[in-house]
Design a protein with these regions (language model features):
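Short, charged/polar surface micro-motifs in flexible loops or helix N-caps
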Residues: 36-39, 47-51, 71, 115-118
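Double-stranded beta-helix
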Residues: 8, 98-131
């Protein structure tokens, strides 16, 4: 299993790495390493034929999965959804979910969790252009 490591930090920022994604295995949670305060971020990798060993849902957090490489199936409330490199999947807290790698190469993804309905400012309303 890969571990995230902090590379650099300064006032208001942290930089970390999980290493080479082509050799990444397992799961690495980043919240504690990078100090996020409004979300959990993790990298995950499933080997060919491997699946998460349980179905689960969340109490408050929605999840956003960004598939970086590989192919797989997300089973969402009993519906099988095929995913591949470039797929983006948003899952509400109450939806039962499980992920499986169906390709010949690992399924590598980023998962971002944040409290559902908590976003009040976003790029165009929160960003400030500096001169």
């Amino acid at each position: 299993m890969n571990q995230a490591t902090l590379q650099q930090s300064g006032k208001g920022y942290n930089v970390a790495t999980v290493g080479n994604l082509s050799t990444f295995e397992g799961k690495a949670f980043l919240k504690e390493i990078i100090g996020t305060t409004s979300m959990e971020v993790s990298f995950g990798s499933l080997a060919p034929g491997q699946s998460v060993p349980f179905f689960h849902h969340h109490k408050q957090n929605e999840e956003l999965y960004i598939v970086l490489s590989g192919e797989g199936i997300f089973t969402l409330d009993g519906n099988e959804i095929n995913v591949q490199s470039g797929s983006i999947v948003r899952i509400a807290p109450s939806v039962s979910r499980c992920t499986q790698c169906t390709g010949s190469t690992p399924l590598v993804y980023i998962c971002i969790q944040a409290k559902e309905d908590s976003l009040t400012q976003y790029t165009m309303t929160d960003g400030v252009i500096e001169e």
